[in-house]
């Protein structure tokens, strides 16, 4: 995949996504400060990694451009669950994925996963993460 695009720092908002240290992250907080008469305003961006949950922060001029991941949100069915991985099948392309449980499944749904249920998964930068369980008819 590796899909990403460039966005100006001044256009970013909390809740959007950014790539920091080659890791797609969700922006939690942005603070902008003006240094004074000369020089451009700087933005401090705090974000949490989608896959690893680590908090990262960067400081950039508001006029700078940063990489933003293109996230594909799709539906899949859980085919099999092993102690280390979950095997899912995309409902449109029937493509199969092996997703590691520790980094590829959102913590709050790990206990609720069962074979045969539908889940929403995100695919970005060649990685897959199961984000939530989909209800009937979604």
Swiss-Prot record:
Keyword Cytoplasm recorded: yes
Keyword terms of this UniProt record: Cytoplasm, Hypusine, Initiation factor, Protein biosynthesis
Disulfide bonds: none
CDD domains: S1_aIF5A
Annotated GO biological process: positive regulation of translational elongation; positive regulation of translational termination
NCBIfam families for this protein: eIF_5A, PRK03999.1
Annotated function: Functions by promoting the formation of the first peptide bond.
PANTHER family the UniProt entry points to: TRANSLATION INITIATION FACTOR 5A FAMILY MEMBER
Assigned protein family: Belongs to the eIF-5A family.
Name of the protein in question: Translation initiation factor 5A
Gene name of this polypeptide: eif5a
